Amino acid sequence: LPVLRKDFIFCDYQIFESTAMGADAVLLIVRILDPQRLANLIQLATSLRLAALVEIYTEADIETAARAGAQMVGINNRNLTSFETDLGRTLKLLPLLQPAQVAVAASGIRSRRDIRHYQAHGVFNFLIGESLVRSENPAGFLKMLQGETNDVSE
C-alpha cells in the first residue's frame, strides 16, 4: 500500500520531511493554504517524486485546486466544521473536476457496498482512514473492501 502523510502540511520543510520519512504522497488541504502556497507545495512535492493529494470540500476549493495544478483531488465527504459525513458529496462534486484530474473519495467509506457505489460512478480511488484504524482486524477489513471476502474476521 502507498504511504500517505496525512497531516496539516503548510511549509516546504514538511514536504522534505515526508520524503525522508519514506512517504509516497502528501495531503495538501485547500482550506488551510493560500493559493500560491498550495501551488508551490504541489510543485515541490512533484519535484521530489511525491504525489500530492489535494483535499477539497467545496466547489470553490475545486477551482483553487485546479489553478494550483492539482492532478489528484481528494473530495472530503466529511464536513470539518460539524464532522458530519455525506457520501453523496463526492458524486456531487465529481463532475466539476477537470478530465485529467484523478478523483479520490475521502472519509466515511465503511463497506464494500460504498466502494461498489463509487465505482459504478467512475470513482476508483479511496482514502480510508478512520474505518481502517477502528477495525479490530485491519487486514480483514481491507480484504472485505477489495471484495476478497465478505467477512472482516477472515
Task: Please identify what each model-predicted range represents.
Residues 10-21, 57-68, 105, 109-128:
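Catalytic cores of alpha/beta
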Residues 17-37, 74-83, 123-141:
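Glycine-rich phosphate-binding active-site loops on the catalytic face of alpha/beta enzymes
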Residues 5-7, 30, 54-56, 77, ...:
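A cross-domain feature marking catalytic cores of carbohydrate-active enzymes
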Residues 1, 20-26, 46-50, 67-74, ...:
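Glycine-enriched alpha-helix->loop->beta-strand junction motifs that scaffold or abut catalytic
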Residues 92-96, 119, 134-154:
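C-terminal helical cap(s) of enzyme catalytic domains, especially alpha/beta-barrels
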Residues 1-53, 61-64, 90-93:
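N-terminal active-site wall of soluble small-molecule enzyme domains
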Residues 66-91:
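Glycine/Thr-rich beta-alpha phosphate-binding loop at enzyme active sites
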Residues 4, 83-85, 91, 101-106, ...:
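Active-site-adjacent loop and "lid" segments of alpha/beta metabolic enzymes
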